[in-house]
UniProtKB/Swiss-Prot annotation:
<dbReference type="InterPro" id="IPR004015">
    <property type="entry name" value="SKI-int_prot_SKIP_SNW-dom"/>
</dbReference>
<comment type="subunit">
    <text>Interacts with cypE.</text>
</comment>
<feature type="region of interest" description="Disordered">
    <location>
        <begin position="347"/>
        <end position="573"/>
    </location>
</feature>
<feature type="region of interest" description="SNW">
    <location>
        <begin position="194"/>
        <end position="360"/>
    </location>
</feature>
<feature type="compositionally biased region" description="Low complexity">
    <location>
        <begin position="30"/>
        <end position="41"/>
    </location>
</feature>
<protein>
    <recommendedName>
        <fullName>Protein snwA</fullName>
    </recommendedName>
</protein>
<dbReference type="Pfam" id="PF02731">
    <property type="entry name" value="SKIP_SNW"/>
</dbReference>
<comment type="similarity">
    <text>Belongs to the SNW family.</text>
</comment>
<feature type="compositionally biased region" description="Basic and acidic residues">
    <location>
        <begin position="646"/>
        <end position="685"/>
    </location>
</feature>
<keyword id="KW-0539">Nucleus</keyword>
<feature type="compositionally biased region" description="Polar residues">
    <location>
        <begin position="618"/>
        <end position="631"/>
    </location>
</feature>
<feature type="region of interest" description="Disordered">
    <location>
        <begin position="88"/>
        <end position="112"/>
    </location>
</feature>
<feature type="compositionally biased region" description="Low complexity">
    <location>
        <begin position="93"/>
        <end position="102"/>
    </location>
</feature>
<feature type="region of interest" description="Disordered">
    <location>
        <begin position="1"/>
        <end position="62"/>
    </location>
</feature>
<feature type="region of interest" description="Disordered">
    <location>
        <begin position="605"/>
        <end position="685"/>
    </location>
</feature>
<dbReference type="GO" id="GO:0005681">
    <property type="term" value="C:spliceosomal complex"/>
</dbReference>
<feature type="compositionally biased region" description="Acidic residues">
    <location>
        <begin position="495"/>
        <end position="507"/>
    </location>
</feature>
Length: 685
């Protein structure tokens, strides 16, 4: 049969502790062997406590260490158990405590004995001790009934005893406080009385002289200690001994750091985003480095680009819509303007047609009357016919020239009418050119007006255009009527002259009328421009130049250089101050006269507004003047004796007669005085 050692592998290392082997321990001495034998004998002779077996431990209370034997606590016994004094707290130092010292256990426990009072009640308050007053009974809650003996005042001895006891207790507390506040080096030593010792030396030298001479009494006194003396002994701090050397760290030799490594390990200084107490100018890159801005990559969301693109598309669409709307409005305005021009042109054409029809009828009547006298005197009839030719416009003139050859077939008449036709055509061409220039000027003025109006706000444009068109239409109609009247008058005057003079006067008249028309248009445009400017200033809340300069103060005018102050030497200096050889005392005036200035300060219209007291207004009015004053009526409306008379008299009064006596009043009669009305009946009769 193989052993266990043969089955196990052979150990690599064998450790042997020779000190624990009993063969290598030193042999004890005989005396020690005897003591050990005696202790072993006592332990063997000591009776061992028998612990009941499991199931038979009813009523068993383990309290000491030996009650547990070699084991632990008994779980079936429901009391507090401390095997081997494990978990026991506190060691009693009082003399009346029960001390258990068994099997080398040095723990002490304080057990309070159970005590009862006179009635047999257990005194549970004994557990708390006797340090203070305890109220554990019902009688402690009831007010105590003091007897007459207890309520008596204490005598002087008791008062003094209580006073001394209280004083000593307070002094003890105060002295303890003072000692704790003193220096630790100072130690108060209690003063002890001197000690007397009788000293007798021993007879070691063998002298047999009188012993009384050798004995002496020694007085022992403590040496006085200086309270301010520094400590004699220096407390040296214990130096820590070096422990075992640190374990060596096996690592490769240090290598030289590169620039990149140094930059990676650089810790930037902290820069606050809220405070800069020293006012340093810190660049933005330093702030980003301190905040760690370069450590993280900035990621921009794609929605920013989408949002920007959407805004751009929306803006382009809005611009296109606005431009289309503006183009549509411009076209509508152009159409409206063309429509108004067509309407005005048609109105002018209708007026011309109407005037030409009236002139044609008048001309035919005159031609019929002239044809009767044509056989008598051809030359005179031609002159009269030229004089009687009424002023006509272009259409009537062209129609008349067409009808003239049909009436007269003579060659002279043809030549005369041909000359007249040429003159009329030339005048018509001049008038057409003038009309074209006038229309071009008016169109330019309208274009300039439209360009100015386009710069105004869109809200006021419609109203302003309508107002301008209405004003222009009225002015144009007025000018056309004036021109037609002037043309008719001048043509009637010019037709009376000779043919050669009429052609020259026609050119001069056209030139003069054109010049006057241009001047009128210029004045009209200037007035219109001034009105528009004032309108814009009023709409914007600004004042016009006239109102602004009129409302300025004199100080503002002086500051702006607009005040035209005319200064003269007479107004600045007094003339009496010049050409005098002495001071003011010679020739300036008397002391009682008030002629300091050469002329009054205010003159003209300003002097009329200055208050001047009347010369006769002195405080010398008499009682008669006050009584004669008309207080209730007009001046001079007083009665006889200077008594004032009011404007409106009371009813039932008559001031035609003067009063000679005092005022007599009639007593008002009551109905009780005449109950039957006899007085009224007598008055009626």
């Amino acid at each position: 049969m193989t052993s266990l050692s043969s089955l196990l592998p052979k150990p690599k290392n064998v450790y042997s502790n020779e000190e624990e082997d009993p063969l290598f321990q030193p042999k004890p001495k005989p005396q020690q062997q005897k003591q050990q034998q005696q202790q072993q004998q006592e332990l063997n002779d000591k009776p061992k406590k028998v612990i009941p077996t499991y199931g038979n431990r009813k009523g068993y209370l383990p309290k000491n260490i030996e009650d547990f034997g070699d084991g632990g606590a008994f779980p079936e016994i429901h009391i507090v158990q401390y095997p081997l004094d494990m978990g026991r707290k506190g060691k009693s130092k009082s003399s009346n405590s029960n001390t258990s010292n068994m099997n080398g256990g040095g723990t002490t426990t304080s057990i309070v004995p159970v005590s009862v009072d006179s009635t047999g009640r257990v005194k549970h308050e004994a557990i708390l001790g006797e340090k203070g007053s305890l109220h554990s009974q019902y009688k402690d809650l009831i007010p105590k009934q003091h007897t007459e003996h207890e309520l008596q005042r204490p005598d002087d001895d008791e008062l003094q005893e209580t006073l001394d006891r209280t004083k000593n207790a307070l002094e003890k507390i105060v002295n303890g406080k003072i000692k704790s506040s003193k220096s630790t080096n100072y130690v108060e030593v209690e003063k002890k009385s001197a000690t007397y010792i009788k000293y007798t030396p021993s007879n070691q030298l063998g002298s047999n002289n009188g012993s009384a001479l050798n004995s002496k009494i020694v007085r022992m006194v403590d040496v006085a200690q200086d309270p301010l003396e520094p400590p004699k002994y220096k407390i040296k701090k214990k130096i820590m001994e070096h422990g075992s050397p640190p374990a060596p760290v096996m690592h490769s030799p240090t290598r030289k750091l590169s620039v990149q490594d140094q930059q990676d390990w650089t810790i930037p200084p902290c820069v606050s985003n809220w405070k800069n107490p020293k006012g340093f100018a810190i660049s933005i890159d330093k702030r980003l480095v301190s905040n760690g801005g370069g450590l993280q990559d900035v990621e921009i969301n794609d929605k920013f680009a989408h949002f920007t693109q959407a805004l751009y598309i929306a803006e382009s669409n809005a611009r296109e819509e606005v431009s289309a709307r503006a183009e549509l409005e411009r076209k509508l305005a152009q159409k409206e303007k063309e429509r108004k021009q067509d309407m005005l042109r048609k109105l002018a054409e209708d007026v011309r047609n109407e005037r030409s029809g009236i002139i044609q009828q008048r001309y035919t009547r005159k031609d019929n009357s002239d044809s009767d006298n044509d056989n008598d005197n051809d030359s005179s009839s031609d002159e009269d016919k030229n004089k009687r030719t009424p002023p006509m416009n272009r259409r009537s003139r062209s129609r008349s020239t067409e009808r003239i050859p049909s009436r007269n077939d003579n060659d002279d008449d043809d030549d005369r009418y041909r000359i007249k036709d040429n003159r009329d055509n030339r005048g018509r061409d001049n008038i057409d050119s003038r009309d074209n220039r006038d229309s071009r000027d008016s169109r330019d003025s309208r274009d300039s007006r439209d360009s100015r109006d386009s710069r105004d706000s869109r809200d006021n444009r419609d109203s302003r255009d309508s107002r301008d068109n209405r004003d222009n239409r009225d002015n144009r109609r007025r000018d056309d009527s004036n021109d037609r009247d002037r043309y008719s008058k001048r043509r009637s005057d010019s037709d009376s002259d000779s043919d050669s003079d009429s052609s020259d006067s026609e050119d001069e008249r056209v030139r003069r009328e054109r010049k006057e028309k241009l001047e009128r248009d210029k004045i009209r445009m200037e007035k219109k421009r001034e009105l528009e400017r004032e309108y814009r200033l009023e709409a914007s809340g600004k004042k016009s130049k006239f109102n602004r300069d009129q409302d300025r103060d004199i100080s503002e005018k002086i500051a702006l250089g607009q005040a035209s102050i005319k200064r003269t030497e007479d107004s600045i200096y007094d003339q009496r101050l010049f050409n005098q050889s002495e001071s003011l005392t010679s020739g300036f005036g008397n002391d009682d006269s008030y002629n300091v200035y050469s002329k009054p300060l205010f003159g003209g219209a300003v002097s009329n507004s200055i208050y001047r007291p009347k010369s006769n207004q002195e405080d010398n009015t008499s009682i008669q003047d006050v009584l004669s004053n008309s207080r209730f009526g007009k001046e001079g409306g007083s009665g006889s004796g200077g008594v004032p008379r009011p404007n409106k008299e009371f009813s039932g009064t008559d001031r035609s007669k003067d009063r000679t006596g005092p005022v007599a009043f009639e007593k008002e009669k009551k109905k009780s005085d005449d109950p039957f009305g006899f007085d009224d009946f007598s008055k009626k009769r």
